[in-house]
A protein has these predicted regions:
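Conserved, structured C-terminal
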Residues: 1-177
Length: 177
């Protein structure tokens, strides 16, 4: 569930005694999770959205899939809920510079190369810290906004050139409006 009204939608569905407090930014910060109940469906809500907007991933037993979707759609009418597809979600994540496994993230790029060093605390010990500090950083993932020809259709894996030399590769691409 993602978007500016996602919190209100979840508040309307949860069985909590004080849902506003449960879903407050102080009690439910970004990248945290809580066990909640939606109409007696045990649900793990994770405060993260692939779109970069306010949102939650909902994890629940698969046998409740249809029931939960029906509840979300019914209650979602009051919040102008719209279903979106994977391409829309992918374009939204690109606009927010979110990285995707298989595109920007993979076995060949460390967090620094992926542009995610803000998630590394070098003041703490962690597995691989020494190797990461010694690693020769050869590339860096950055977000480019290209104001180019209207017939340009970037998708991913295209080479990036400067002065006739390949200087990188596009990992993801798409249009933004």
């Amino acid at each position: 569930i993602a978007g500016p009204k996602s919190k209100e939608l979840l508040i309307s569905l949860t069985n909590s005694e004080n849902p506003e407090q449960l879903f407050s930014n102080e009690n439910f910060p970004w990248l945290s999770s809580k066990e909640i109940e939606i109409n007696m469906i045990p649900t793990l809500a994770i405060r993260v959205a692939y779109t970069g907007e306010l949102g939650w991933e909902l994890h629940y037993p698969v046998e409740f899939q249809n029931k939960l979707l029906d509840l979300l759609l019914l209650s979602g009418k009051n919040f102008d809920l719209k279903l979106v597809g994977a391409r829309a979600q992918n374009w939204l994540r690109q606009e927010k510079s979110y990285r995707a496994f298989g595109n920007e993230l993979g076995r060949d790029a460390c967090l620094v190369e992926a542009g995610l060093e803000k998630f590394i605390n070098f003041n703490k010990e962690f597995l691989g810290k020494d190797a990461l500090q010694k690693r020769n950083i050869k590339s860096k993932c950055v977000t480019l906004l290209i104001d180019g020809p209207k017939d340009c259709d970037p998708w991913g894996r295209e080479a990036i050139y400067k002065d006739g030399k390949t200087i990188g590769r596009l990992t993801s691409g798409g249009y933004s409006v």
